[in-house]
């Protein structure tokens, strides 16, 4: 049984809790949004070549929301893509008024730009592949068939979100629940059969999430009402075996609101997937999970990838802002000498100044940001962009 303490039974609030990971206050960003915000701090001025995430339907979910951007390419159906690619125009995100209206305008323009930017890329990947499995006519199956084509077509996006509704079974649950689980089973089976044809079934992990579970008793209408302790299911050939993880909630032990008592926190599941499937650095996971500590569950996955910010490896380029005594330093590990530039931007992409334009010798470098810029910087968040050896690297930092 997966959930969180004092389960909220509102569809909207609990959906936000599962998307944001914050259950004691209203957090405006999602857990994947925070990851992509950390990964692409200069998203508005230097977006990646492929969409960070693809979301089909369920557009109100904040799971991919950052502070200033939504990082998912979101569509109702893939047939819309060609029209967007042919008719889209880009919007200015620099000359924005400094007010509440400007904040909203920036968000809308950035989201629209992302859609137009990636439409052709997604269309090309979609048309480069075909399906090799029978998905049936169900909505979930059709969504997964599109995802399979994007993966097989070489899009390169790592996170996809699809949806299956109608689990709010206040009435006629036995028949409806069986139909839904059969749809889920058939769709997942077809999806992995399709991926297996291209040898990709062990490289894709599927996971279900829902805002809550159901009560442990019938409600008088042949259904059940909103409850706690929902199941989370994982799928994929990359899982080491299959089975039940954790303890099943005691069917005879309820909380004060007549709910089953969860035995696993949903953020433990997130932490486990981020650690052992996506192989993220612990400091990044800490940001994603709002600086809270959670357990790692034995889900049958194990990471084999090294951290991307390992300063002990002298053969890898690394960079990180370090805060000491009210001063911000940019520390870099340069594996081979080369000329490079480092430029500082504000959050809407305006260039603030050049931090460095020089030959960087092999080894460790530490640069005082304020001293290098040579002018007063207002308190707040900024983005630095390193150009070195034909590559570009970015990260956000705080001026305090």
Name each region found by the language model:
Residues 301-325, 333-335:
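Residue-level detector of functionally pivotal "anchor" positions at catalytic/ligand-binding pockets or at interdomain
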Residues 227:
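Phosphate-handling catalytic cores of nucleic-acid transaction enzymes
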Residues 354, 359-362, 370, 375-400:
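C-terminal tail/sorting-segment detector
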Residues 331-336, 346, 386-388:
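Non-cytosolic beta-sheet module surface loops
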Residues 338-341:
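Short beta-strand/loop motifs in extracellular/secreted proteins, especially
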Residues 1-187, 193-197, 217, 231-238, ...:
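Feature for exported/extracytoplasmic and membrane-associated proteins, marking the mature portion
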Residues 345-352, 382:
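Short, glycine-anchored, charge-dense loop/turn motifs used at functional sites
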Residues 188, 194-220:
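Metal-dependent active-site segment of extracytoplasmic phospho-/sulfohydrolases and closely related
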């Amino acid at each position: 049984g997966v959930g969180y303490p004092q389960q909220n039974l509102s569809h909207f609030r609990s959906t936000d809790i599962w998307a944001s990971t914050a259950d004691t206050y209203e957090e405006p960003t999602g857990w994947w949004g925070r990851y992509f915000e950390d990964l692409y701090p200069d998203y508005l001025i230097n977006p990646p070549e492929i969409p960070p995430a693809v979301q089909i339907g369920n557009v109100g979910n904040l799971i991919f929301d950052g502070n200033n951007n939504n990082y998912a390419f979101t569509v109702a159906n893939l047939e819309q893509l060609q029209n967007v690619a042919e008719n889209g125009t880009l919007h200015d995100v620099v000359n924005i008024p400094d007010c509440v209206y400007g904040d909203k305008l920036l968000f809308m323009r950035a989201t629209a730009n992302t859609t137009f930017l990636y439409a052709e890329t997604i269309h090309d990947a979609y048309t480069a592949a075909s399906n090799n499995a029978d998905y049936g006519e169900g909505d979930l199956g059709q969504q997964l068939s599109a995802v399979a084509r994007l993966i097989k077509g070489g899009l390169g996006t790592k996170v996809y979100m699809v949806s299956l509704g109608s689990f709010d079974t206040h009435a006629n649950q036995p028949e409806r629940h069986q139909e839904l689980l059969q749809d889920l089973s058939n769709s997942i089976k077809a999806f992995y059969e399709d991926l297996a044809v291209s040898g990709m079934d062990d490289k894709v992990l599927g996971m279900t999430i829902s805002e809550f579970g159901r009560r442990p008793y019938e409600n008088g209408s042949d259904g059940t009402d909103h409850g706690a302790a929902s199941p989370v299911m994982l799928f994929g050939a990359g899982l080491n075996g299959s089975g039940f993880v954790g303890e099943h909630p005691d069917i005879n032990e309820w909380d004060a609101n007549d709910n089953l008592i969860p035995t696993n926190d949903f953020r433990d599941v997130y932490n486990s997937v981020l650690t052992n499937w996506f192989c993220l650095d612990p400091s990044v996971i800490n940001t994603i999970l709002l600086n809270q500590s959670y357990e790692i569950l034995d889900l049958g996955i194990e990471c084999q990838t090294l951290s991307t910010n390992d300063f002990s490896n002298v053969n890898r380029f690394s960079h990180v802002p370090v805060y000491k005594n009210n001063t911000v330093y940019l520390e870099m590990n340069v594996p081979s000498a080369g000329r490079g530039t480092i430029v500082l931007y504000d959050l809407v992409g305006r260039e603030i100044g050049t931090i460095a334009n020089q030959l960087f010798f092999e080894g460790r470098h530490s640069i005082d940001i304020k001293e290098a810029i040579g002018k007063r910087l207002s308190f707040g968040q900024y983005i630095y962009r390193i150009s070195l050896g034909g590559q570009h690297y970015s990260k956000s930092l705080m001026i305090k």
